[in-house]
Amino acid sequence: MKILKPAVAGTLESSDCMVTVEPGCGELELDLDSTVIRQYGKQIRRVISETLTRLEVTDARVTVVDKGALDCTIKARVECAVYRSNDIRDALPWGGAIQ
């Protein structure tokens, strides 16, 4: 899925994350800022990467500011930001129903 325009999902509240997606420059670029990066940084990056791969996003700039969100929350925020960037609003395939 191509990122058509900048989009944001989530908040900066505790146990949440804010995900921003923007059109890329030919590659996937991930910028992660997390309050728990030392403990869970690799896992957070893995969840983001797997979600983007499942959505077939290969060219985007993704910025995630994490405040201790669970994996399921991170996944949902990434999905939401990608769908918003494409103005997809109806019949959303949430929770891994894609493919």
Provide a role label for each language-model segment.
Residues 1-99:
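N-terminal intrinsically disordered, cationic/polar leader segments
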